[in-house]
Amino acid sequence: MRLHCIVEDVDTARVAAEGGATVIQLRLKGVPTLAVVEAGRPVAALCRKSNAAFVVNDDVEAALALNADGVHLGRGDEGKELARAAGLMLGISATSIYEAIAAAEQGATYIGAGPIWETPTKPDAGSAIGLDGLAAICEAVKVPVVAIGGVDASNARDCIAAGAKGVAVVRASKDASEVRAAVDAAKTF
């Protein structure tokens, strides 16, 4: 759970794996399931070789076809029951204590909380919750929380100090080794 790197291609996944990613999440928004499966095959193989967990974003069917370790779903996405029944690790996004509690009740294996800070990667993510919002979510649920949104090597340690069990990065995936070093340096793990 320490370092989730969210990627769109195998080249970025490779850099993330070499940098110490513990989870590599393939996120291809608006892409049909068959295309996700095709793009995901080399990423899944890379994850198996590097011992990183492989998670597919928003597509339970693709996750199952790729024999992924898990799937990450948004609050309103369907497929949570299928993911749980299939034994997949289930990540669910949350932007508030209420949403985090609901995610835990829906069987989340982990909660992606954020955005912690504003991020250009996902302009529709809503208002930043900050470290105080992250800490409140971490205190409200027993499920591990992964901080996302504007996280990089300069602030990953702050997320861990606020109670997160890990951080998720998109833009910083190419700097995974620096983010991993910052996360590992946190004494609150």
What residue spans do the PLM features occupy?
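A short, flexible beta-alpha/helix-coil linker loop
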Residues: 29, 117-119
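Glycine/threonine-rich flexible loop motifs
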Residues: 121-123
